[in-house]
Amino acid sequence: MTTELLAPAGGQEALVAAVQSGADAVYMGFGAYNARRSARNFSDEEFRAAVSYCHLRGVKVYLTLNTLVTDRELPALAAEARTASECGVDAILVQDWGVLATLQKIIPDVPLHASTQMSLHTLSGVQEAARLGMTRAVLTRELSRGEIAEICQKSPIEIETFVHGALCMCYSGQCEMSAVIGRRSGNRGACAQPTAFPAGRTAIR
């Protein structure tokens, strides 16, 4: 079993820091269809340069296209995916099942990972992701170490799990708290991180 240390790269400084600190891979976004819209992210040219920078140092690059999209938005997302493929991206993370089907048609050689936003929290869910052609499943952040270990033992594909960072109280991909409280949808990449706010008693009427 090989362990991979994966770190987020929300901008150039974060990318360099992750690589210099020993990350085996980084995940990053460019364009409008990733779950890290609050990060600086990368332009097309910056993304191409970032992939080259990482690959020269033996570091893999994963693109996040892991938000829900509408039919109207799908062509633009597909164009971003093609650009990433041309840049040599190592894999793409997705949430939307329609995006999965589209990318399998237009860039069939690029591995696709099931984002934590897909709410995969059982072995059967991971097995279904594998059946549909995904090569890695990012488990939801709410699972215990024991549950993660059990899934890893029987999973037919690679498993990724969060060990540091935002630890949501709701199942990943199913939380509407940010949208209700701050009118910012976590499923559209704009989560306000309400579960990180100081808690108090509030009367709800």
Label the model's feature ranges.
Residues 1-120, 138-139, 147-205:
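Active-site pocket-lining/capping segments in soluble small-molecule metabolic enzymes
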Residues 92, 132-133:
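Hydrophobic alpha-helical bundles that form the membrane domains of multi-pass transporters
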Residues 122-124:
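Conserved nucleotide-cofactor-binding alpha/beta core module
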